[in-house]
Structure formats: structure tokens, C-alpha cells
Amino acid sequence: MGSCGGKHTGKGAPKPYSRNFTDPWRKTPGRLFGTALIRFYQITLSSLIGNSCRHLPTCSEYAYEAIARHGLWRGGWMGFFRVVRCGPFGTHGFDPVPRELSPDLKWYMPWRYWRCSASRIGK
């Protein structure tokens, strides 16, 4: 039997598992603060509340990715409105974070982020 030298390459290399966004993103103070809040919620409160999200990715995963991709202000509003849409009479199903936001989503009009989802924007 061979021993593992710790250097995996190729197809057999183990991949780190994370339920959160793993692409590279700018580590600004606002983004780090927002993603840290989401991660704190995932580790502590989420286990007490249980699996109650009606979407995929879950609302906390969505908020984490939205903040990582689009910053604390835009991503925070997107995450907030996603949680609001997740109620009993709200939406459900696959609803990923859009890769790019349309130019009509201005920072001073956060109510427009209500309709912000990849399926609605088409990206």
C-alpha cells in the first residue's frame, strides 16, 4: 500500500466543498463584513431555525454570493428582498444570483432590487 504524500493532481484531486460562493471576489471591507455576517448566521442561527428555505440556492447562500459579487449595498438589498420573497406566498425554486446587474438598477433606488434575479434579468 502506498502512502499519501499530500500532493493530489489531476481528476482524483479532492475538491474543497463549500456551500457558499467560491469564485474569486474583491475583498473590500464592506464585502468582508457582509459575508462575515451571513457566515455567522449560517453557523449559529441557521441550525436552530432548520431547513425552511424554498429556493435553491438558499437565501443565506444567495445573500453571501450577492454581497461577494455586487458589494454590500447592492448585494445586501438583493439578499433582503430574496428573504422577503421566500415567504409562504412568495416564490420558490431555482433562483441564482445574476452575474451582472442591469444599468437601470441605481444605488439610490434600492426598491428596484426586488425584481433582481438571474431568471428575470436573463443572465
UniProtKB/Swiss-Prot annotation:
It holds the Pfam family YidD. Keywords: Cell inner membrane, Cell membrane, Membrane. It is found in: Cell inner membrane. It is a peripheral membrane protein. Its main location: membrane. Coiled coil: none annotated. One of its GO terms (cellular component) is plasma membrane. Residues 1-23 are annotated as: Disordered. HAMAP family: UPF0161_YidD (MF_00386). PANTHER family: MEMBRANE PROTEIN INSERTION EFFICIENCY FACTOR-RELATED. Could be involved in insertion of integral membrane proteins into the membrane. Belongs to the UPF0161 family. This is Putative membrane protein insertion efficiency factor.
